[in-house]
């Protein structure tokens, strides 16, 4: 359903906010703080026309009936590694047991995304984003680069052999830095 255009969209992520302004240029996107219940209460009280939240968090809390729309990766590029689960163990312990849980495609995608973000010094609060997908023997990666100097952002894509996923992420980030500056 479409949002009420007279009230702002609530969002706590600069990365999502940048992309929302392109999706809904006629709408105000306003920062929202507080835990999930506080944010939902503000929505229910009419302060916002909608909230942009991670669906996984709502599902985990049994609140998926509150979800009215999902965004595709083409609409809102996710943070690197979003949706990928990791299992860690101390060195030398349980590696063989845990190896059966590893999905090589997810691992390659995660390496590409993390490499992109690392080159750009992106962190949890930085609006840098990357999404990689493995199809067959190829890795397809899309990156969002935010230029701090003027707060413009750019999205580019590349692809290559999945065995070089990490290098693909690094190369995309370096190319975007060269092309768009800092």
Range-by-range predicted roles:
Residues 1-27:
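A conserved helix-loop-strand patch within extracytoplasmic ligand-binding domains
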Residues 17, 22-182:
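Small-molecule-sensing regulatory modules
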């Amino acid at each position: 359903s479409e949002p009420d255009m007279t009230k702002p969209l609530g969002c706590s992520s600069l990365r999502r906010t940048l992309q929302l302004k392109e999706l809904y240029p006629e709408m105000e996107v306003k920062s929202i703080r507080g835990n999930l219940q506080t944010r939902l209460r503000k929505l229910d009280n009419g302060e916002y026309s909608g909230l942009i939240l991670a669906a996984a968090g709502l599902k985990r809390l049994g609140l998926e009936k509150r979800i009215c729309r999902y965004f595709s990766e083409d609409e809102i590029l996710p943070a690197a590694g979003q949706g990928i689960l990791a299992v860690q163990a101390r060195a030398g312990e349980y590696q063989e047991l845990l190896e059966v849980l590893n999905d090589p495609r997810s691992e390659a995608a995660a390496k590409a995304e993390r490499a992109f973000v690392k080159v750009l010094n992106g962190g949890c609060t930085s609006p840098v984003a990357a999404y990689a997908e493995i199809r067959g023997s190829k890795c397809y990666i899309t990156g969002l680069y935010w230029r701090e100097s003027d707060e413009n952002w750019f999205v580019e894509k590349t692809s290559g052999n999945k065995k070089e996923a990490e290098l693909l992420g690094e190369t995309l980030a370096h190319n975007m830095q060269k092309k768009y500056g800092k």
